[in-house]
């Protein structure tokens, strides 16, 4: 199975992740991971920190001469802003300074509930870890997951499907063409017809001192039928995907396939009819079974059915606003208006990269559970045997 933990604070020296379970023999490089880190830092509407941080990963263990060796993989992403925070965030008691305590909790953040839970009078102890800066190292972890999936010809593509109520229309393109289209967009959207309108909205919102959210969509193609399980609640793949998506900072809703729209339709207009053509298996398809629609989003009963996985997730507007919101000081109990030094106006494009990463992690985990081995070669043998079985099912 694919297990990982992340550690580190937003203004600490670095973010760290340890990944366990990756088989030996998988090609992996810092350069390939850095491509995804750069994508996360891009997108129209980002704030001042992106000018400070130019994320680069360091692989500290688990990889030798460009290939995994089967032991835990350690990744780290340095925080370049650390030089300005060494004393404020020092683990050493001699640097303690009670005069720099942050006692003004910001609406929409983890500040107040976190301080209440952990008995902190300085909400910096909460905001440093709850920050979306943590997603930098999660994207690095997701890049490792994607390397595994791509080895087995499973590909993912995340993009902005909606921004501030402006909806993009996804063109009928193959996965490679869709990724190429999104790569050309400053907003990581697949619909150039609405990109200008989206950028205009971001500019207007920025001028008003506000922020804007949106919806991201991730498609995974090449996923075989049979990942996940119906036998226990925590093995259902759609449940695991939903949890992973909701773990992303500022995400407030998840849909798989038709999602909430299915509730407004009759059953005959929701469920994907099943067809069979034996010749499809001999022409490159994994199986002779196929669908004309994909309202299920590639998952039925918690199990992949061979169609593309389609996940949508909603991101709320960033709660750090230049337009002050009212709050209360947790020490003095006096009201105040929250202020900010720097913030993104819109991070939805970056969020599409994070969503792509966490979906990759869940799919990689499900794939390893199904076809696991200690080496890539062993997994290949297991997978090849399963594909042969599917063709004749």
Curated annotation (Swiss-Prot):
Annotated protein name in UniProt: Chorismate synthase
Its biological purpose: This reaction introduces a second double bond into the aromatic ring system.
Organism: Geotalea daltonii (strain DSM 22248 / JCM 15807 / FRC-32)
Cleaved signal peptide residues: none
Catalytic activity: 5-O-(1-carboxyvinyl)-3-phosphoshikimate = chorismate + phosphate
Family statement drawn from the similarity comment of this UniProt entry: Belongs to the chorismate synthase family.
UniProt remark on cofactor binding: Reduced FMN (FMNH(2)).
Biological pathway: Metabolic intermediate biosynthesis; chorismate biosynthesis; chorismate from D-erythrose 4-phosphate and phosphoenolpyruvate: step 7/7
Pfam families: Chorismate_synt
GO molecular function: chorismate synthase activity; FMN binding
Alphabetical list of InterPro entries matching this protein: Chorismate_synth (IPR000453), Chorismate_synth_AroC_sf (IPR035904), Chorismate_synthase_CS (IPR020541)
Disulfide bonds: none
Gene Ontology process terms (BP): amino acid biosynthetic process; aromatic amino acid family biosynthetic process; chorismate biosynthetic process
């Amino acid at each position: 199975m694919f297990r990982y933990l992340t550690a580190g604070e937003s203004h600490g020296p670095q973010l760290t992740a340890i990944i366990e379970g990756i088989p030996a023999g998988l090609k992996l490089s810092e350069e390939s991971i850095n491509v995804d880190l750069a994508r996360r830092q891009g997108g129209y509407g980002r704030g001042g920190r992106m000018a400070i941080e130019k994320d680069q990963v360091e692989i500290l263990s688990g990889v030798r001469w460009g290939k995994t060796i089967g032991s835990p993989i350690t990744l780290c992403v340095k925080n370049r802003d650390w030089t300005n925070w060494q004393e404020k965030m020092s683990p050493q008691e001699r640097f303690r300074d009670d005069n720099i305590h942050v006692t003004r909790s910001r609406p929409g953040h983890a500040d107040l509930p976190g301080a209440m839970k952990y008995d902190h009078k300085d909400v910096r102890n909460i905001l440093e870890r709850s920050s979306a800066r943590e997603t930098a190292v999660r994207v690095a972890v997701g890049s490792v997951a994607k390397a595994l999936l791509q080895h087995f010809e499973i590909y993912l593509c995340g993009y902005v499907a909606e921004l501030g109520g402006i909806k993009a229309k996804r063109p009928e393109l193959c996965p490679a063409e869709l990724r190429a289209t999104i790569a050309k967009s400053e907003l990581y959207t697949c619909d150039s017809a609405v990109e200008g309108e989206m950028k205009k909205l971001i500019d207007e919102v920025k001028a008003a001192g506000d922020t804007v959210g949106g919806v991201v969509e991730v498609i995974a193609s090449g996923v075989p039928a049979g990942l996940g399980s119906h036998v226990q609640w925590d093995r259902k793949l759609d449940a695991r995907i939903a949890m992973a998506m909701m773990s992303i900072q500022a995400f407030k809703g998840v849909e798989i396939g038709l999602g909430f729209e299915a509730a407004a339709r009759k059953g005959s207009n929701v469920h994907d009819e099943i067809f069979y053509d034996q010749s499809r298996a001999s022409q490159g398809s994994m199986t002779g079974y196929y669908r004309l629609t994909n309202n299920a989003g590639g998952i039925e009963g918690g199990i992949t059915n061979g169609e593309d996985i389609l996940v949508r997730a909603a991101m709320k507007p960033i709660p750090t606003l230049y337009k002050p919101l009212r709050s209360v000081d947790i020490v003095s109990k006096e009201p105040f208006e929250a202020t900010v030094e720097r913030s993104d106006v819109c991070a939805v494009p970056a969020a599409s990269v994070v969503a792509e990463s966490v979906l990759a992690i869940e799919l990689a985990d499900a794939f390893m559970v199904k076809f696991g081995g200690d080496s890539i070669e062993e997994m290949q043998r297991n997978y090849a045997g399963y594909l042969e079985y599917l063709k004749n099912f």
